Each structure stands twice: as C-alpha cells, then as structure tokens.
C-alpha cells in the first residue's frame, strides 16, 4: 500500500513514422503490447489514474505508427469501461499530444507547456476521455481549457472482444508480415470507431 502509485503516465512509444512502417511488428509489440501491459498493471494495482500519451494523428490513422497508437487507445478505452462496469478503482485517460515547438512552429506549444497541460489532464474528468493537447481541434471537440486542451468522449464498451482482437494481433506480430499486420490493425480500428463527442 505504501509503494502503490496513485498516477501512471504511460509515454513510452515508438513514434518514428517511417521506421514503424518498415518494422510494423515493433510498432505492435511496443505501442500496443506495452500499453496492454501498463493498463492491465494499473488496474491490477488499483492505480487511481492512468494517462496514456498518444499521437495527434491517431484520430484518423494513415500509417503503422498511427494505427498502433489508435489500437492502444481502443484498448485503454475498453479497459476504462470494464473498470467502470466492475466498480474498479482506476480511471484511464488518453492524451493526444500535437507537435511541440520548436519542431512544429504553427502549433505554438512548448515542451514545458505540453507537460504542464498533460499533468492537468491527469486530474480532470471521469475516465475514458481522449484529450487533445496543443494540436489542432475540429468542430466535434468540446473546449475544456481555453484553446490548449480539447476533449473527446469516445466510449468503447466491449472489453472482452477488444482484448481478444488485440492479443491475437500481438501474437501475429511475431510473424513480421507487414501487410498482414497492417490489415489486422485496420480491421480492429473500424470495429470501434470514434463516437460523437459529449
């Protein structure tokens, strides 16, 4: 009890787009399997809040890295719904970080500002939300804190099915057949599309 964490920020990921397109199995094993491990452990040890750091383009994925981040988001969202249903103690959130200055000057968010806003997200909401920090929003997003944080409520309620699909994908990832792996990720994402925001 003394060493049980209250907050977990899961930011480990492979985010190099071309590298992940070349090594799709690594995108799956790190970005998806790693997230499954962290989410499961956060629930097991009754962490109060888990925040997964995702990618801005996971909303509409176009490459292996973005698909792997969206599949990981789906797993976190379904885990949060299961925990709510089973009266679990852990709330899970997703933060999609936009490009951070100086790598992207049209965004106008610094690294320290991105960190501060991510910490703020860690104490907001009821779980299951996707927060877009420092990235471009669209008409479907509710403004939460001025222009810097947007919220998207996207519920994925079928944990058992999601877990089965995701674990099968991770198992297939050891074959290293890129086209098959991309196809399997694309198959998972449309099954659990983004719902309308609230």
Predicted feature locations:
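Conserved Rossmann-fold cofactor-binding substructure of NAD(P)-dependent oxidoreductases
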Residues: 1-7
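Strand-loop microenvironment adjacent to phosphate/nucleotide-handling motifs in alpha/beta enzyme folds
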Residues: 74, 78-198
């Amino acid at each position: 009890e003394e060493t049980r964490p209250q907050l977990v920020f899961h930011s480990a990921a492979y985010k190099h787009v071309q590298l992940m397109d070349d090594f799709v199995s690594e995108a799956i094993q790190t970005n998806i399997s790693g997230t499954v491990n962290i989410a499961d452990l956060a629930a097991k040890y009754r962490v109060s809040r888990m925040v997964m750091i995702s990618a801005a383009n996971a909303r509409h994925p176009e490459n292996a890295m973005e698909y792997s981040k969206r599949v990981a988001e789906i797993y976190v969202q379904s885990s949060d719904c299961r925990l709510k249903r089973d009266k679990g103690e852990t709330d899970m959130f997703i933060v999609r970080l936009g490009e951070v200055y100086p790598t992207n000057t049209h965004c106008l968010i610094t690294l320290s500002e991105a960190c501060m806003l991510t910490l703020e997200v860690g104490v907001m909401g009821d779980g299951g939300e996707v927060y877009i920090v420092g990235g471009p929003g669209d008409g479907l997003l509710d403004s939460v804190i001025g222009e810097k944080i947007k919220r998207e409520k996207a519920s994925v309620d079928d944990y058992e099915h999601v877990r089965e699909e995701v674990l099968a994908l991770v198992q297939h990832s050891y074959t290293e057949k890129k086209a098959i792996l991309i196809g399997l990720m694309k198959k998972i994402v449309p099954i659990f599309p983004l719902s309308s925001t609230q």
